[in-house]
Amino acid sequence: MITSIRYRGFSFYYKDNDNKYKEIFDEILAYNFKTVKVLRNIDDTKVSLIDTKYGRYVFKVFAPKTKRNERFLKSFVKGDYYQNLIVETDRVRSAGLTFPNDFYFLAERKIFNYASVFIMLIEYVEGVELNDMPIIPENVKAEIKASMEKLHALNMLSGDPHRGNFIVSKDGVRIIDLSGKSCTAERKARDRLAMERHLGIANEIKDYGYYSVIYRTKLRKFIKKLKGKA
C-alpha cells in the first residue's frame, strides 16, 4: 500500500505507512547520510548508493531543467509518471511478483499537478549486471522471458529492457528502472522487440501491438527516406 501525505513541504508517497521512510527522508534533507557510490551524475539527474541506519538504498533526484512550460501544460492532461510508477510497483509486488526492484518513497515539489523536483528512495539490488556478462546464459534468458511475461500479464512495462537494467542476484534475476507509463499492447511489443535486440530473447508474440510497432517503424523509415531525397 502506498500512503500519500503532505510532509515538509512535499507531496510524499511512501510504502506501507512505514515511518522509517519519513526518517530517511528527514536525514536526506539534513544531508545526514553516507554516499557509498555515485551511480549517475548529470545536469538534471543524480543517482547514488547511500548507507542509512536501515541499510543501503538507491537515492535518486530528478530536477528537469528543460521544457518546463511544456511539462507544466502536459501535467494537466497526463498523469504523474513517478507517482504512477511507485503505485504500480507496489501493486505488482503485492501480487507476488518480486522481479521488479522495490520503490520505497517519492517526494515531489508540486504546483497543481506539476512537479519540479522528484526525490526517490529505491531498493538496491546486489548482484551481477548483465552488462558484466560477455554471454548471457540460456537459463538466465529463460528466467527473464518468463518474468517479463508475468510483468506484462500484470500490465506493467520495463520500458527499456537493455543489459544494464537486469541484475542476477542471489535470489534470481531482477529488473530495475521500470516505466511509469500506461501499459498498452504496443508498449508491451516494444519491450519484447527490445529484449530481442539487446538480450537475444526472440519475440514469439505477433499480436496487434507487434504489427502496430512494425508498421510505424517502416512508415518512419519511409518518410525519412523521402525527406532525404527532397
From Swiss-Prot:
Could you say which enzyme class this protein belongs to? Answer: transferase
State the reactions this protein catalyses: alpha-D-Glc-(1->3)-[L-alpha-D-Hep-(1->7)]-L-alpha-D-Hep-(1->3)-4-O-PO3(2-)-L-alpha-D-Hep-(1->5)-[alpha-Kdo-(2->4)]-alpha-Kdo-(2->6)-lipid A + ATP = alpha-D-Glc-(1->3)-[L-alpha-D-Hep-(1->7)]-4-O-PO3(2-)-L-alpha-D-Hep-(1->3)-4-O-PO3(2-)-L-alpha-D-Hep-(1->5)-[alpha-Kdo-(2->4)]-alpha-Kdo-(2->6)-lipid A + ADP + H(+)
Is Transferase found in the keyword set? Answer: yes
| Record GO biological process | lipopolysaccharide core region biosynthetic process
Give, as in the UniProt entry, the pathway in which the protein acts.
Bacterial outer membrane biogenesis; LPS core biosynthesis
Q: What happens biologically when this protein's gene is inactivated, per the record?
A: Mutation of the gene results in a core oligosaccharide devoid of phosphate on HepII.
Q: What is its EC number?
A: 2.7.1.-
Source species, domain of life? Bacteria
Question: Which GO molecular-function terms appear in the entry?
Answer: ATP binding; kinase activity
Q: InterPro entries this protein is in?
A: Kinase-like_dom_sf, LipoPS_heptP_kinase
Q: What are the entry keywords?
A: ATP-binding, Kinase, Lipopolysaccharide biosynthesis, Nucleotide-binding, Transferase
One matching Pfam family is WaaY
Q: What does this protein do?
A: Kinase involved in the biosynthesis of the core oligosaccharide region of lipopolysaccharide (LPS). Catalyzes the phosphorylation of the second heptose unit (HepII) of the inner core.
The family this protein is said to belong to? Belongs to the protein kinase superfamily. RfaY/WaaY family.
Name under which the protein is recorded: Lipopolysaccharide core heptose(II) kinase WaaY
Organism of derivation: Escherichia coli
Gene coding for it: waaY
